[in-house]
Amino acid sequence: MVPIDMMSGENKTEEYLAKNPLGRMPLLELDDGTCIAESIAICRYLENEIPDPPLFGTTSLEKAMIEMWQRRMEFQFLNPMIDIFRNTHEMWKDRIVQIPQAAEIASEGVKEQMVGLDQELEEKEYIAGGGYSVADITAQCAFVMGKAAVGIRIPENLSNLSDWWSRVTSRPTARA
């Protein structure tokens, strides 16, 4: 694993752009030089190479439910957190036209979605039901980004969501 410092623009170097012309992260470079970009594409590749534990499910129903929840976590949390970050963080001020109102709208939407997810987690330990899955990973990444980049935190009164957060962040892989 080679860490890339996005804050200093390492992902915009000629060397990195040769591997991923969009300059985005993450990027998985295989031993043969093949480069795979985009989180879910990388996760699917790794799942096929190392299928245990199955993060995308094993039955048709599990796969569909996990995919459904993964997409919801992407649309309801990850994408809005990215929008908030891009429209408020100093790092982006000379890279894009920042629209503070877009960040405010996204932030309000995230808060509303947290209430809904808290209710959803009332009857289950993990987002897609069953065990830990890529849906949990997507949500976890969104909340890590939200907390680190723009200070968004899970409110304490959302006890189901807070309990879920404690479960996923206490996993050994969360500390790796």
Predicted regions and their residues:
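GST-like fold's C-terminal all-alpha helical module
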Residues: 70-170
